[in-house]
Amino acid sequence: MARRMIVTLLAAFGLLASPAWAVERGALFKVSGHGHTMVLFGTIHMGLPEFFPLDESITKALAASTTLALEIDPTVQTAETAAAVQRVALTTPAIVAAMPPALGPRLTRRLEALGAPAALSSQLKPWMLLITLTTVEYAKLGYRPDLGVDAHLAKLAHGRHIKVIGLETVESQLGLFDRLPVADQWTLLDETLASLDSGEGQQEMRSVTRGWARADRAALDALALKYEKDPRLSSQILQRRFLAERNGPMADKLDGLLAREHHTMAAVGLMHLIGKDSLPALLRAKGLKVERVY
């Protein structure tokens, strides 16, 4: 379901009460090859103050690295980036006309409940409405992008003059949504509304975040298996386009980085590191040694 899209693309959020001292969180791997080493860490993109400080093994690995690789660097978004997002996110009359009739009233109610203008439904593409609605829902729960783990690591790296590189671009990430057939976009939005209305989406956020916050390998692996076995369209889209199709190019870039530099660190969304088509699995397939630390 699209609630899984929420988890993957908007960062595996949920409710959490955590102690304010460093503990193991997420998923951590050590990758060796080409005579070099890389630390690979699973993150979430919006966070709470309770997520910090990070485990000392993470901060030490970053301090020892010459480069930090992220999906994108969230600290350097520009006005040009915002303009590009606006250009690609605006809808067309044909897309609006394809909205399922029953979806319109539900979408209007949700927008109004959030204090957003109902006119957004005829201004933004379905996938951008999905992002907007879910981001606002997470914000209501206290989650903030400036407290995302990626942003935290990027700030630390910049402060220590460690090079930060992006494995992807904002444009490429938005393109994953924008290339979806219009009917699929409306289906994803429909399922997102249903999961938020029922509370199921929020519960799944909690499950993923608890797994991340406790570095609960069994729970995270169980979630990955659950998503992989779900036959619904949105889960298939998630597995194919938002994970598998991205993981291949990212694995190639990480392999190249490992070959070039002695000590590096990569931090990407948690869901990229679990499941059968995960980055660790792809890196192993390249002949690299991949060890799970936790």
Regions found by a protein language model. Name each.
Residues 1-5:
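Positively charged n-region of N-terminal signal peptides that target proteins for export
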Residues 7-17:
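Bacterial N-terminal signal peptides
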Residues 8, 32-34, 259-260:
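Short hydrophobic "helix-edge" motifs at membrane interfaces and signal-peptide entry regions
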Residues 13-14, 53, 279:
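Alpha-helical transmembrane segments and their juxtamembrane interfaces
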Residues 16-17, 56, 282:
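Residues in and immediately flanking transmembrane alpha helices
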Residues 18-22:
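Sec/Tat signal peptide C-region and signal peptidase I cleavage site
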Residues 23-238, 242:
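Structured, acidic catalytic/metal-binding patches in enzyme active sites
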Residues 236-294:
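A cross-kingdom marker for long, charged
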